[in-house]
Curated annotation (Swiss-Prot):
One of its GO terms (cellular component) is cytoplasm. This is Trigger factor. It comes from Burkholderia thailandensis (strain ATCC 700388 / DSM 13276 / CCUG 48851 / CIP 106301 / E264). Transmembrane segments: none annotated. Involved in protein export. Acts as a chaperone by maintaining the newly synthesized protein in an open conformation. Functions as a peptidyl-prolyl cis-trans isomerase. Its EC number is 5.2.1.8. The gene is tig. Coiled coil: none annotated. Its main location: cytoplasm.
């Protein structure tokens, strides 16, 4: 008998599954006989329990298992014979109005994959960021690297790097060690008192009033001042209140930045300390970073453009699956941060509804585009990307071996290559506008994405 697939909506379908009772019963009997060979009951040796007693004990459980297996098998057969592209898992329910003597009847309700219509790529608009790495970017990077290697010396005490100047008072950039006592209405509060507290002036770690009070103090000097905590201060007990502080300076240390010389170059991995080589290597590294960031920005632009010109209905089942996947990813992230009981964190799936719908929709569009235009990743493309990624490491060959030793890592790189193929394909047809941006702006844009 032909299977009738009912259309319940844009993507929702229903089909009736009929299972002859004699076929089901035959399978139930076979499983109970097999079960009886090993079942244990008080008063009987293993395998010697009467079949009737085994059936009385386990018939309901075995029947449910057989029906579940048979329904799944029959649904698979129907979906193949009817060329149904089932999205997600079907739901099965007994058919209440079925007048089929000698048969079990179930309704299988499910969704199918949608037809994806991708519009004219020539109408897509993409802004492609470009950047140039010059001396200014190299100098800025060197300045950051020097600050990362800063070391401090007590003001006023001579040494191989000097004494920091005649002024021994605390200045912006100095590392200071202080004691402080804070009170509100004459009463000390939690977190308001500390000894040998260390911070760097000007880094913004402390509230502005506190830093202002510490500025200009010399070792041994103290200052009293009022400090009003912001209304949104993380310490709720003191938020919005004014405290009276006394800060005592115990040590003032000035920052000494290392000179850009051969020793500095060697600390960056330039074995012979050649400064020209150092700058060339920094330029190469910045170039790779700029390429990675521009690729990320343009990829997002291409994906947005594809969504704008594509038409499709999104299966709810796939959205729900992805929502649950995002919840699990969020819990894993919490666990990695050390949050207790992260695996059971009450994260509502609703908060990921919009993100999941976009991810599923984009996945369907990309799959259609890749299939229609042969944009699958080729082995040589994957190897080229792995080699490029490995260049930034000390032992590139080891990184390549590390990638090819794990199928999951390799699959992630394959997905990256497919996305790159899609981006290149779309850029070759879309309206592309190039925009020159500074490396700093590029870094800021990708950080906010």
């Amino acid at each position: 008998m032909a299977n009738v697939v009912e259309n319940l909506g844009k993507l929702e379908r229903r089909v009736t599954i009929s299972l002859p009772k004699d076929v089901v019963q035959k399978e139930i009997d076979a499983r109970i006989q097999k079960l009886a060979k090993n079942v244990r009951m008080p008063g009987f040796r293993p395998g010697k329990v009467p079949l009737k007693m085994v059936a009385q004990q386990y018939a309901g459980q075995v029947e449910a298992e057989v029906l579940s297996d048979k329904i799944g098998q029959e649904f698979f057969t129907i979906s193949r014979s009817e060329n149904l592209r089932v999205a997600g898992q079907p739901s099965f329910a007994p058919k209440q109005d079925a007048a089929q003597e000698g048969a079990y009847a179930f309704d299988a309700t499910f969704e199918v994959y949608p037809e994806v219509k991708i519009g004219d790529l020539a109408t897509a608009e993409v802004e492609r960021s470009t950047t140039t790495i010059g001396d200014a970017e190299i100098d800025r990077t060197l300045d950051i690297l020097r600050k990362q290697r800063v070391h401090f010396h007590a003001r006023g005490e001579g040494g191989e790097h000097g004494d920091g100047g005649a002024d021994t008072s605390a200045q912006n950039g100095d590392r200071v060690t202080v004691d402080f006592v804070g009170k509100i209405d004459g009463v000390a509060f939690q977190g308001g008192t500390a000894e040998d507290f260390v911070f760097v002036l000007g880094e913004g770690r402390m509230l502005p009033e506190f830093e202002t009070a510490a500025l200009g103090l010399k070792t041994g000097e103290a200052r009293e001042f009022d400090l009003k905590f912001p209304d949104d201060y993380h310490g709720k007990d003191v938020a919005g209140k004014t405290a009276q502080f006394t800060v005592t300076m115990k040590k003032v240390e000035w920052p000494h930045l290392p000179a850009i010389d051969a020793d500095f170059a060697k600390s960056l991995g330039i074995e012979d300390g050649d400064l020209t080589k150092m700058r060339e290597e920094i330029k190469e590294n910045l170039g790779r970073e700029a390429k990675r960031r521009t690729q990320s920005i343009v990829k997002n632009q291409v994906m947005d453009a594809l969504l704008k010109i594509s038409e499709l209905d999104v299966p709810k089942a796939l959205i729900e699956q992805d929502q649950q996947r995002l919840v699990e990813m969020a819990r894993q992230d919490l666990a990695q941060r050390g949050v207790p009981n992260a695996k059971d964190a009450p994260i509502p799936v609703e908060m990921f509804a919009e993100q999941a719908e976009r991810r599923v929709k984009l996945g369907l569009v990309l799959a259609e585009l890749v299939k229609a235009n042969g944009l699958e990743a080729k082995p040589e493309q994957i190897r080229a990307e792995v080699d490029e990624f490995a260049k930034s490491y000390e032992d590139p060959k080891e990184v390549v071996r590390w990638y090819y030793s794990n199928q999951q890592r390799l699959a992630e790189m394959e997905a990256f290559v497919v996305e790159s193929n899609v981006v290149d394909f779309v850029l070759g047809k879309a309206k592309v506008t190039d925009k020159e941006v500074s490396f700093e702006a590029l870094a800021s844009a990708t950080a906010q994405a």
